A protein has these predicted regions:
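Nucleotide-activated donor-binding/catalytic signature segment of Leloir-type glycosyltransferases, i.e.
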Residues: 240-262
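Membrane-proximal helix-turn-helix segments that form the acceptor-binding/catalytic region
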Residues: 129-162
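Active-site donor-binding segments of glycosyltransferases and PAPS-dependent sulfotransferases
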Residues: 26-98
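Short hydrophobic beta-strand element within catalytic cores of glycosyltransferases
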Residues: 292-296, 305
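Conserved donor-binding/catalytic core segment of Leloir-type glycosyltransferases
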Residues: 194-213, 219-225, 231
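Acidic donor-binding loop of glycosyltransferase active sites
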Residues: 266-278, 291
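A charged, aromatic-enriched C-terminal amphipathic alpha-helix characteristic of glycosyltransferases
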Residues: 317-320, 334-376
């Protein structure tokens, strides 16, 4: 079984990139096809550079540094890869990778991190949060995204079997592409996080500091609770704005090296998470340290946090809802959720589990495909 892995880009070490590396570990003879890639990123991920095949965008001006500027070319570029020599194509997709062209005798399995959020269900939120909901720039962006949405509709039908990274994304795949998906939660490497029972008197929030992560909402909540400390870790375009927003009880540290993040995560009273994520890796990392999570009760958080056992939920992305949840958490005692229970829950998202489930799914579907062809749901 000759395998090709398709990914939109390999330019940062993110969650989808780690998924690609894990799939490559399962199928070590596979080749990787991606629009653009950086060698240092592949080296950090442990992906051999000689296995990586890039598109013409790689050679365009600033192709690897400003690859998103070439979004209108992505559909055309992904279709130029010639994968005729492979039996199975596995696309790791949150944009156009699922649009790869395959033949009738090739099996295409898509590990879908999300339908394109800024083209579908988050379209209006994206425009608003990017300040592109009004004016000439707004119409230019809308005109650019319209053909991307049309392509994505077509690309969605090119997949033989979908894997979703969460049940929540599976529902969105059903809504967007009218297709069923099997959920296999992504691989979370918790080997670098150790269980810690020594909790201190502060809460932690950490993510990239962009609007949809709702870090500002968390800061506003703790501004209303001057007797409670909040530490915020992460870099991003909103860093200075969030520092100005924070009161004296809130420390916005900005980007920090891993050792600092891990130390703060291990000793935090609880981790506060307000984003509406497709899956969300960092709450699992927090729980792997034995730190419970106070999370927005929607989307992937309902799968990554075991409500009542490793944390609790709030129902609205508002400061008031977070205040209510934190007060409820504190009313439950000094350590309402056992660190060992948090760690045990996090271990259920291990890399070994992911690799086993991916291997079983691909091999099972390939055997069915060889015998009976495609049975589209």
């Amino acid at each position: 079984m000759k395998v090709a892995i398709v990914q939109e880009w390999l330019v940062t070490v993110g969650g989808s990139d780690k998924v690609v590396k894990a799939i490559l570990d399962v199928f070590p003879d596979a080749d990787i096809y991606t629009l653009v890639a950086k060698k240092d990123v592949c080296d950090e991920l442990g992906i051999p550079w000689e296995k990586v095949h890039t598109s013409f965008i790689q050679k365009m001006p600033l192709g690897t540094k400003k690859h998103r500027a070439y979004l209108p070319l992505f559909p055309f570029a992904i279709e130029q890869f010639d994968l005729r020599g492979y039996d199975v194509v596995i696309s790791s997709s949150h944009c156009v990778a699922k649009g790869i062209l395959t033949k009738a005798d090739q099996l295409h399995i898509c590990y879908c991190h999300s339908p394109i959020r800024y083209c579908w269900d988050m379209y209006n939120e994206y425009l608003e949060e990017s300040h592109l909901d009004k004016g000439i720039k707004s119409w230019l962006v809308r005109l650019m995204l319209h053909p991307i949405r049309q392509f994505d509709t077509i690309a969605g039908s090119r997949v033989d079997y979908y894997i979703s990274n969460s049940d929540y994304v599976g529902q969105r795949i059903r809504k967007t592409y009218r297709r069923k998906a099997t959920t296999i939660h992504p691989n979370i490497d918790i080997s670098n996080f150790e269980l810690c029972n020594d909790k201190q008197e502060y809460y932690l929030a950490s993510s990239r500091l962009v609007a949809y992560k709702k870090i500002d909402t968390i800061i506003e909540a703790f501004n209303l609770m001057p007797d409670k400390k909040l530490v915020v870790i992460g870099g991003g375009p909103n860093l200075e704005a969030y520092r100005k927003l924070a009161n004296a009880n809130v420390t916005v540290m900005g980007y920090q090296p891993f050792d600092v993040l891990k130390d703060k995560m291990q000793h935090a009273k609880a981790f506060v998470f307000a984003a509406d994520e497709d899956f969300g890796m960092i709450p699992i990392e927090a729980q792997s340290c034995g730190t419970p999570v106070i999370a927005y009760g929607h989307g992937g958080s309902l799968e990554t946090v075991n409500g009542g056992k490793t944390g609790l939920f709030f129902n609205e992305q508002t400061p008031e809802a977070i205040v209510e949840a934190v007060n409820k958490f504190e009313s439950m005692g000094s350590q309402p959720f056992a660190p060992a229970d948090c760690r045990q829950w996090a271990e259920g998202f291990s890399e070994e589990r992911f690799k086993r489930e991916i291997k079983e799914f691909v091999e099972e579907k390939y055997e069915e495909f060889k015998k009976n062809g495609i049975n589209i749901d």
